[in-house]
Amino acid sequence: MALSPAAAGRTGRNNNNDAGLADPLLPAGGGGGGGKDKYWVPADEEEEICRGEDGGRPPAPPLLYRTFKVSGVLLHPYRLLTLVRLIAVVLFLAWRLKHRDSDAMWLWWISIAGDFWFGVTWLLNQASKLNPVKRVPDLSLLRRRFDDGGLPGIDVFINTVDPVDEPMLYTMNSILSILATDYPADRHAAYLSDDGASLAHYEGLIETARFAALWVPFCRKHRVEPRAPESYFAAKAAPYAGPALPEEFFGDRRLVRREYEEFKARLDALFTDIPQRSEASVGNANTKGAKATLMADGTPWPGTWTEPAENHKKGQHAGIVKVMLSHPGEEPQLGMPASSGHPLDFSAVDVRLPILVYIAREKRPGYDHQKKAGAMNAQLRVSALLSNAPFIFNFDGDHYINNSQAFRAALCFMLDCRHGDDTAFVQFPQRFDDVDPTDRYCNHNRVFFDATLLGLNGVQGPSYVGTGCMFRRVALYGADPPRWRPEDDDAKALGCPGRYGNSMPFINTIPAAASQERSIASPAAASLDETAAMAEVEEVMTCAYEDGTEWGDGVGWVYDIATEDVVTGFRLHRKGWRSMYCAMEPDAFRGTAPINLTERLYQILRWSGGSLEMFFSRNCPLLAGCRLRPMQRVAYANMTAYPVSALFMVVYDLLPVIWLSHHGEFHIQKPFSTYVAYLVAVIAMIEVIGLVEIKWAGLTLLDWWRNEQFYMIGATGVYLAAVLHIVLKRLLGLKGVRFKLTAKQLAGGARERFAELYDVHWSPLLAPTVVVMAVNVTAIGAAAGKAVVGGWTPAQVAGASAGLVFNVWVLVLLYPFALGIMGRWSKRPCALFALLVAACAAVAAGFVAVHAVLAAGSAAPSWLGWSRGATAILPSSWRLKRGF
């Protein structure tokens, strides 16, 4: 698969043809780029014209990205519909308050509170999308300005914990894609943080460094995409567009593929070789009889052992830093010509490899290691002593670089003369491989990434989502953006020992990071092997180093909240920094996502629980300072408070139970016709708004529909669990939401690829949604039985019909959940429909039978009429809140 040629209609002022970069929201070659697209129009043309009319002044630096806004043809109706719907919701709430139901005031007040809450959350969600902006980087201008030696350094952080739950092959592919990316080898460094201190990861990284000596020059020579070998060899071959002859390319490709298969075999063998090596060693035991896990040279591994022992188990082990690949030097180094022992010709290829470092921070009992945030902060300090690049990229271990131009694209925003200095981070969307074709559990989450984040891009910038993000190092250190920084503030003022710890070598790197905007510093290149230097590196990742400092609070990634990503981005925005959103075609990065229902729900539980932790902490968006823009504050309030909707959603979904215990009394807002008219209007308008949003965001109806369905799935179970957990945490002092590593599975053949989709892992998280489904199925069956028995008045028929529509709609929204708990039977969706029909029929038959028995002896009790009011007071806005 060769590097894709530039799209014919790629966006850009200079008709540049940088391979791999096209309009963020349009397929390559689709419609002449963003500037000519009918939904997006340039927003910075006047600024560019003014810059061209310099009036004899020195020419201003060129703009490194273009800004586009939604055309007024779509944007004005979108805003108007939002305003009209807001007015309709206000009028509806006022009408409901005026027409009170005195027969069931307690339930009426609950429904009023629910409708008000849903109206507020819808407004919070919608307000941040009223000014969507997309920005398209110009790579050709970046190359002309900085490829002569001015490109800044980039440190890349990769995080992993378990080589089984997070397959090591994914992690090593991520590293290979980073080493091979289209960026000068002497200007970027890769750091693997192994929070499990596994010898398998360490030796796997050794194998990866060896294979990289072949893979990286091959990628540079033939300009292949993507540069993660697993994805590259799995993709369908595209026409070759590299500089070599096709025959040479295909010969090289066969050799590299064979070497890659051997590399994978060596990785797999580590899981048997390491235990066998340790078992075979004579006298291999510590004083307590535990067998040590041995490295290849026979010495005990300082990290975790296969047989846990004191100081060698999870949560208790020494810190480890190993430099796998040292600094390559600044001058290109050409490879060897083809020979009998080296069949690939690299004589015209720069074969240098970037710095590669293995890190396992120290862990000891009695210390809270702060999970991913703690690991990232340790990487931040270690990298400062070894490479100290001014910019940092972070990846999860299951993500890889899919577009080798991604680093350059992010720098277009960081180095632009308009807002570059005030930009703290550039966020890329998350895209995933091996998600089922219908995206049953909304893993792609396109409504959030392609609509909500584009909306925030027009305010202060998108939120940080945990991976695929470039940071400015000094912003993470807690510095203020230049526009908020006093003129007499020197970068050296950042280096306060009480704030950053007692390592003076580390503190001395902070001013250097603040001042190096265009060149990489490699202070450790000549001293990586010196004992004192490495001792200092080990010191900054000890457990006690952060005691009495601001790490995890005002410095680095934020601690004590499960969603450390969102709260860290919020801290930067609160200080006045901006962020930028960058989507590319082809996608900049791709990763894996949980396609099993239970794993996906646990992932959502961590997100929703962490959001509530943030809302009820001192990082609450409502308490932020004046530097946070009002609309950005609104967006963060929406991101952190949305799980509360579950309280009202569950009440609405369980109304049939309420009426079963309420003697069959039927209450609905009167006058009925006016109520239904309002209800239809407010729901219909949100559907129309959604259709307009689909147009400008480049979504599909399936994307939008899956978002609606999974919001209901989350609200009936996971969000409720998050709310209850936070309540218990406040009342009983429980710990925060427990971090559960989302297990990933290696993709197998066609039969195994989606095997996890059909596995049922029963968990308490499934129970609430199962109950909601059962209640609504029972309501439908009981209503059918009541219809057979007869005895309804016309008014009751109208009310029951409205209730049945609601019951059916709840089941339609929970359809993906129902498939998930059916396991392998979900391969035949018709079985689900047959099961639901049979369940409703069974309930109806039971209702009729009980009614007949009781009617034969005496009058039927009042509770048999409960089904007529199964959903008596319908929620007016029960599905107005989008996103999760």
From Swiss-Prot:
Signal peptide: none annotated. Its main location: Golgi. Substrate binds at D396, D398. SUPFAM superfamilies: Nucleotide-diphospho-sugar transferases (SSF53448). GO terms for molecular function: cellulose synthase (UDP-forming) activity. Its EC number is 2.4.1.-. It is an enzyme of class 2 (transferase). One of its GO terms (biological process) is cell wall organization. Keywords: Cell wall biogenesis/degradation, Glycosyltransferase, Golgi apparatus, Membrane, Transferase, Transmembrane, Transmembrane helix. InterPro entries: Cellulose_synth, Nucleotide-diphossugar_trans. The chain crosses the membrane at residues 73-93, 104-124, 640-660, 672-692, 708-728, 765-785, 802-822, 830-850. Residues 1-34 are annotated as: Disordered. It is found in: Golgi apparatus membrane. The active site is at D195, D565. Residues 1-27 have a biased composition (Low complexity). It is a multi-pass membrane protein. GO terms for cellular component: Golgi membrane; plasma membrane. Belongs to the glycosyltransferase 2 family. Plant cellulose synthase-like F subfamily. May catalyze both beta-1,3 and beta-1,4 glycosidic linkage on beta-D-glucan. Essential for (1,3;1,4)-beta-D-glucans synthesis in grasses and cereals (Poaceae). The mixed-linked glucans (which are not present in walls of dicotyledons or most other monocotyledonous plants) are particularly important constituents of the walls of the starchy endosperm and aleurone cells of cereal grains such as oats, wheat, rice and barley. They can account for up to 70% by weight of the wall. This is Probable mixed-linked glucan synthase 9.
